[in-house]
């Protein structure tokens, strides 16, 4: 796009937590689709890069993240999904990230989380929020269509595998991820579902997930996968960590959580992972944006769903 003035104006508007017009959302999603369709299921990302976990519509905390981590395009970012649901500002959060993607496609990578799904967003807030803010379901439809185009995973310098949830018993090789047809709603089971839903667990082999989707996977599964694919570690999100990040299995799996004071009541801190060009790791810990800097909606937009 030769003229970025409209897009830059929309980005500024979204940064003030103001929604853009429905027809602007439609056009933005059309442009985003053109970019995302070219990305692979295992999207290649070059260091240096800052890796982020779940955001969940906590817009003012996303602003805090950029405050401590630096802005796009000065910094290169990878977000590991779950942009929407549960927080008060899923619309502004997702549209800001999407607008940044369209404006600076090589400086921000967005991969899909289990909440980037039609079914899940109808239960956990994004659908209702779109309806409330736009008076129709059109914006929800445009956004959920884009969800289908998001990459399923990313690999940094060929060495750090990034995925929202975890591993799948159906996948031994990265090439098996590359051959998935991702342009669909998240299935209830199978490899695509597992990548977005699974969790590491102190055990050997595979276990039944209490989430009802995906699997629990043990340290032996990880060492086999990492060895087979010649990678150093797996970086993922998907689980609340009170300290913002958590190592598993002798530093072969890392959970990063980037939504501070999750659901505005969990009291956790958040983290982002800064990787330099040598893949040296630096964790930046941050707290929720101060109360006075955030507009809290006058009434709660949704019921207290279980965490």
UniProtKB/Swiss-Prot annotation:
Q: How is the cofactor bound?
A: Binds 2 manganese ions per subunit.
**Modification Leucine methyl ester, positions:** 307
Q: Which reaction does it catalyse?
A: O-phospho-L-seryl-[protein] + H2O = L-seryl-[protein] + phosphate; O-phospho-L-threonyl-[protein] + H2O = L-threonyl-[protein] + phosphate
Biological process (GO), any one: microtubule-based process
Q: Which residues form the active site?
A: 115
| GO terms of molecular function | metal ion binding; protein serine/threonine phosphatase activity
One matching Pfam family: Metallophos
- What is the similarity comment for this entry? Belongs to the PPP phosphatase family. PP-4 (PP-X) subfamily.
Task: Report the protein's function.
Answer: Protein phosphatase that regulates many processes such as microtubule organization at centrosomes. The probable PP4 complex Pp4-19C-PPP4R2r-flfl (PPP4C-PPP4R2-PPP4R3) is required to prevent caspase-induced cell death (in vitro).
The name on file for this protein is Serine/threonine-protein phosphatase 4 catalytic subunit
Q: What is the lineage of its organism?
A: Eukaryota, Metazoa, Ecdysozoa, Arthropoda, Hexapoda
In the UniProt record, the gene name given for this protein reads: Pp4-19C
């Amino acid at each position: 796009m030769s003229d970025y003035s409209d897009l830059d104006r929309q980005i500024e508007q979204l940064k003030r937590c103001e929604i853009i017009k429905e027809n602007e959302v439609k056009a933005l999603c059309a442009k985003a689709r053109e970019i995302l369709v070219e990305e692979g299921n295992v999207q290649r990302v070059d260091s240096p890069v800052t890796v982020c976990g779940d955001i969940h519509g906590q817009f003012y905390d996303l602003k805090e993240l950029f405050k401590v981590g630096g802005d796009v395009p000065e910094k290169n970012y990878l977000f590991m999904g779950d942009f929407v649901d549960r927080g008060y500002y899923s619309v502004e959060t997702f549209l800001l990230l999407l607008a940044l993607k369209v404006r600076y496609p090589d400086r921000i990578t967005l991969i899909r989380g289990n909440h980037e799904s039609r079914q899940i967003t109808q239960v956990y807030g994004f659908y209702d929020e779109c309806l409330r803010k736009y008076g129709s379901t059109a914006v929800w439809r445009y956004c959920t269509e884009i969800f289908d185009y998001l990459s399923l995973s990313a690999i940094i310098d060929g060495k750090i595998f990034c995925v929202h949830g975890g591993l799948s018993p159906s996948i031994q090789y990265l090439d098996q991820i590359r051959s998935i047809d991702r342009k669909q709603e998240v299935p209830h089971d199978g490899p695509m579902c597992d990548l977005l839903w699974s969790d590491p667990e102190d055990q050997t082999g595979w276990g039944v997930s209490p989430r009802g989707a995906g699997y629990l996977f043990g340290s032996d599964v990880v060492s086999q996968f990492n060895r087979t694919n010649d990678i150093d570690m797996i970086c993922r999100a998907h689980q609340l960590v009170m300290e913002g990040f958590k190592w598993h299995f002798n530093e072969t799996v890392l959970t990063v959580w980037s939504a501070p004071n999750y659901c505005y009541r969990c009291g956790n801190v958040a983290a982002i992972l800064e990787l330099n060009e040598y893949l040296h790791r630096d964790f930046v810990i941050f707290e929720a944006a101060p109360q006075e800097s955030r507009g809290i909606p006058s009434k709660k937009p949704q019921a207290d769903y279980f965490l």
